Amino acid sequence: MNQTKISLPFGSWKSPISAKMLTEAGIAMSDLRTYKGSSFWRESRPAEKGRQVLMQRDAIGVIQSWTPPDWNVRTRVHEYGGNAYVLFDGGVVFSNFADQRLYWQKTPGSAPIALTPAGFQYADGFFDAANQRLVFVREDHQPSTVKEHGEEQNEIVAIAIPSDGAPLDAGQVLVTGSDFYAFPRVNRKGDQLVWVEWDH
């Protein structure tokens, strides 16, 4: 192997790394999880105005997007966002950034079906298999709630497993009283709920 050594003053060599390369936004992945032999994650796409989509890699290595164009899997709960999707046997339930409502998709690319009414935001969803329900952190942004309390109210709620033709469901309140909630989880027997909470 014949290599010629080149000596140059410090800082005068031509680097393959450019300022453009360092400042250009790249695709980012978050909220990685596995479900029934597949891997799922949220993918942020700067070229699509930061839209976030749910991606899946199945057991044989096929990668596909679940999220149709013009949908954005992202939540505004606590202003920082958080986990914006939950997987269960019937597909995926996700928070859509534009209106913060929960939507259900049965299969990749299928039309999302609205599950919740306007005026609420949801995050940190969990599939409670023992009780066949979904558990979420919910922020109540309804004008009547904000008027009564002076700000939105945070709660942990249970939402029925989606089914065709079911009415919109804002959720049954399980826990309330603190300023913030995160990471609600139910044990396998379905008789204990744990979460993180904090106040201003």
List each model region and its residues.
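A short beta-strand motif characteristic of beta-propeller blades
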Residues: 15-23, 64-75, 111-116, 170-175
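Short loop/turn segments that connect beta-strands within the blades of beta-propeller domains
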Residues: 35, 50, 59, 88-89, ...
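A flexible loop/linker signature enriched in serine peptidases of the S9 family
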Residues: 43-53, 73-79, 94-102, 117-123, ...
